Amino acid sequence: MTAEVQQPSVQTPAHSSPMTEKPVQTPVMETSSSSSSTKAKKTNAGIRRPEKPPYSYIALIVMAIQSSPTKRLTLSEIYQFLQSRFPFFRGSYQGWKNSVRHNLSLNECFIKLPKGLGRPGKGHYWTIDPASEFMFEEGSFRRRPRGFRRKCQALKPSMYSMMNGLGFNHIPESYNFQGGGGGLSCPPNSLSLESGIGMMNGHLASNMEGMGLAGHSMPHLSTNSGHSYMGSCTGSSGTEYPHHDSSASPLLTSGGVMDPHAVYSSTASAWPSAPPTSLNNGTSYIKQQPLSPCNPGASSLQPSLPTHSLEQSYLHQNGHGTTDLQGIPRYHTQSPSMCDRKEFVFSFNAMTSSSMHSPGSSSYYHHQQVSYQDIKPCVM
């Protein structure tokens, strides 16, 4: 009995021993695997990846292509050159290959050569664009984005148009304003810089921009800017003056045609014998002969006797003893008569629409007063 009782007691530990040993062995295996992985991570963390070469991918590709005797390489040959030259491309990191492919396809300085017959599939040769070789001379690897040359070529016309907007080469060869007896022709090179800038500022309206009247439409500029341009204009004298008012413009005669004898007359005979008048106080009147349909004797005049004699007062104010006229043209008339002065709103559009036929469209004004002044002849 004792032996039978002892046998189960001996067998029970034998059956229970494998159950107790298994839980003890499994944690040991897990800890060993985790310790090996951490050791591997520690060893990998200690090893640093080689430093990237201090060149852009464009420069690296150019180095590879220029190293070839034929100046062309395939994509795989470019990979081999970079891996043999720089340790950075030998590691486990493979993202640089995508960068090489993108730079080859996205930059215009690289050209994909067409493959010959009998070579299907991959393996295209890449070379450097001959127009872009200057970018990489003497080791100067300058990055140029896609479409750089197109942008440079597109900027050239815009710069040219901007320079034209400032008044350079802005006027065509001639402006012909047909009036009663002829036309006005102004060369394009005589436009001053101030008048060109005034055109851009919008002081001259529509069709009157080419006549160079910047001195009469821009109070902030000196009047010699307009006269310097009109002084170089040449006009064809007409045979007769039309039957309308002659106060259209101090620079033009009654028919819209500049008299060549009236531009910059430097003799003293062009000045009136009467003492100089003053325009500062607005009390004196300028004498002028009326040319109206009511006066038939004044309707036709010879071109040799010009109605207006234009003179710049700032050039002759010391010789003639006048200090009140500052940059305002003076006039000499054959038979002076009293004229009235009226205020009006200065408008170039009215002058162009009426072709300078209305008596109220005068092109000069007195700047010292608030409103512009018009010197008009009395209609008899």
From Swiss-Prot:
A GO BP entry: sprouting angiogenesis
InterPro entries per UniProt: Fork_head_dom (IPR001766), Forkhead_box_regulator (IPR051770), TF_fork_head_CS_1 (IPR018122), TF_fork_head_CS_2 (IPR030456), WH-like_DNA-bd_sf (IPR036388), WH_DNA-bd_sf (IPR036390)
Cited Gene3D superfamilies: Winged helix-like DNA-binding domain superfamily/Winged helix DNA-binding domain
Sorted UniProt keywords: DNA-binding, Nucleus
PROSITE patterns, per database record: FORK_HEAD_1, FORK_HEAD_2, FORK_HEAD_3
Source taxon at top rank: Eukaryota
Biased composition (Polar residues): 1-19
SMART domains according to UniProt: FH (SM00339)
Stretch list, region Disordered: 1-49
A GO CC term assigned to this protein in UniProt: nucleus
Pfam families assigned to the protein according to its UniProt record, in alphabetical order: Forkhead
DNA-binding region (UniProt annotation): 52-146
Name under which the protein is recorded: Forkhead box protein F1
Organism: Danio rerio
Gene coding for it: foxf1
